[in-house]
Swiss-Prot record:
This is Transmembrane inner ear expressed protein. The gene is TMIE. Residues 28-57 are extracellular. The chain crosses the membrane at residues 58-78. The keyword Transmembrane applies. Keywords: Deafness, Disease variant, Membrane, Non-syndromic deafness, Signal, Transmembrane, Transmembrane helix.
């Protein structure tokens, strides 16, 4: 070593690096243990205690009763009922049919302002409305009679 200057500190650094690597590798090695293997957990049965000293079937029963009570409450609130007899089915059908006919009739009724006269409304506006609307046969006959009466008065 006398021939290589500075070899002493280099050997020390190399030895330290080798020691760190060996320590890392040694930490990854698995040492066999002499302890017996861990016992398997008992199988899950209906008598298994889940929590609060309640068995599994207790928990399932309480949960299903809770879900059933929610379903019954919602059906009562929204009036969901299955008809049981033929009469009830036919009555429900007729009721829906009558409701549909009623709504169809309501759609054909014109708005209230078209059915009644508004006080203070100009007669010119009324005439414009008549021109904009579709004339019926009765309106045309009345207009023809008025025109004929004017012509007869004009001739006399």
């Amino acid at each position: 070593m006398a021939g290589w200057p500075g070899a002493g500190p280099l050997c020390v650094l190399g030895g330290a690096a080798l020691g760190v690597c060996l320590a890392g590798v040694a930490g990854q090695l698995v040492e066999p243990s002499t302890a017996p293997p861990k016992p398997k957990p008992p199988p899950l049965t209906k008598e298994t205690v889940v929590f609060w000293d309640m068995r599994l079937w207790h928990v399932v029963g309480i949960f299903s009763l809770f879900v059933l009570s929610i379903i019954i409450t919602l059906c009562c609130v929204f009036n969901c009922r299955v008809p049981r007899t033929r009469k009830e089915i036919e009555a429900r059908y007729l009721q829906r049919k009558a409701a549909k006919m009623y709504t169809d009739k309501l759609e054909t009724v014109p708005p209230l302002n078209e059915l009644t006269e508004v006080p203070g409304e100009d007669k010119k506006k009324k005439k414009k409305k008549k021109k904009d609307s579709v004339d019926t046969v009765a309106i045309k006959v009345e207009e023809d009679e008025k025109n004929e009466a004017k012509k007869k008065k004009g001739e006399k």
